[in-house]
Amino acid sequence: YEAHSMEHGDHVALNYDLDAPLVECTSIEDWKQKAKGHKVFITPHHMGYQGGYRGYNWKCFTEGDITPFVEMYSRHGLAESDQGDYPYLHDMGPRQWEGTIQYGLELGNKFGIMASTDQHSGYPGSYGDGRIGVMAPSLTRDAIWEALRTRHVCAATGDKIIIDFRLNDAFMGDVVRGNSRRIYLNVTGESCIDYVDIVKNGQILARMNGPLTPIAPEGDTVRCKVKVDFGWNREEKYVHWQGKLSVDKGQIHSVTPCFRGAAFTSPQEGETEFHTHVNR
């Protein structure tokens, strides 16, 4: 569930227990105190809005198990900085530097970075609205929760992007000390990769560019990912369809759905109830 705060910014609770109680609190700080001893993450949400009007207040950030990560992207937009792609377009205003991720890093805070959809219409994971990536040894509930707690997370805006980043064998989110630096990086996306930046203290340490055109060694088997788009229709009208996709002289090894949820987040005028429509 979610709590709004003009003073501290909006926050979202993610509970381990499915029957966790709804906590009554007077402020976000009171909420954090009452959450101690419980398996719950309290995460700052759409952080880049104006301070004092639902934007994040970094003075209330508490490093630790309650808030191991913060939300950099959702369907509200991108809070990495007050510039760049995916601006905030909601009626709560444009982005403000003092609530952004880069501002929090400049203060010396340690936190993981994630994204989430904020899909009010019952479509968690809606394509293009933000998603979290977790590096865990297995897909069990305990393994995923521990990976979240230890900040082994990353953020993606739409496609699933696998990021395996290590510094002297430490994973994303770990804290290490050393006199030398050895970086390992492996990135796999659902489309061609334009570039990868390694950023340190607000400065680009290295940039790796992908090829402008696909590269396939002569005589090698062609391996590729193909994105299929279909539609379109008026956003308020639903269309029931069934489709089939096949390939000649080849094999389809996997399919990654890119289904989007409803194009709105609030009840529509004149509607007293909303029915979730399922893509599969």
Task: Identify the function of each model-found stretch.
Residues 1-280:
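Extended, charged catalytic domains and RNA/DNA-binding interfaces, predominantly
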